[in-house]
Amino acid sequence: VHLGERDCSIQRNNQKVIEETPSPALNRQQREEIGEIVRKAIEKIGYTNAGTLEFLFEDGRFYFMEMNTRLQVEHPITEAVTGIDIVREQIRVASGAALGYTQDDVTFSGHAIECRINAEDPETFAPCPGKITEWHAPGGLGVRVDSEIYSGYSIPPFYDSMIAKLIVSGKTRNAALMRLRRALEEFVIEGVKTTIPLHQDIISQAEFIDGQYNIHWLEQFMARKYGK
């Protein structure tokens, strides 16, 4: 069973920054094609449990890169458009339970976008460990924040810089983008620098709004804006 695709093209140094589903780069036929390819591939190799197959897409063709035999950071956007709790299903299947649905049971509704909120300088991407002096996460319909951060929390310098995931969903991509703009405005993190301003900048660009971006877009945008 496949749960649709995710577009992870907004990235820097091969590190994902923003993810969304469904991909604005695919039409319905291409979406159905890659979904069926993945479903058949998993069936052929006899794989059981959650997994993610990654592809490059260029000139209307898919190029397989790798398979990650686990959940991905961006799994909440898939949960948002399918209504399936992937973490729960992973645990059930690992315990020996059968998958509780078939491909025909899987439906896709709306659009979802995730921003990875990192404790980094939004211009240089230098890590910014330190103490959180103020923390206010956005909320409301179609807004989800996954994080363990709180006011007074000290971010250590030893690990990955991601401190939160902001996930928004809406009936359409435009609705999700409107919700994302509001959520980013409401998101307050003080005491350290974060990539919130970068996300606000990205989603205000015409190329992103139109869905006309690729894996090189962010680095090209940063080079144009900051000369780096």
Question: What do these predicted ranges mean?
Answer:
Residues V1-K228:
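ATP-dependent carboxylate activation and anion-phosphoryl transfer catalytic cores
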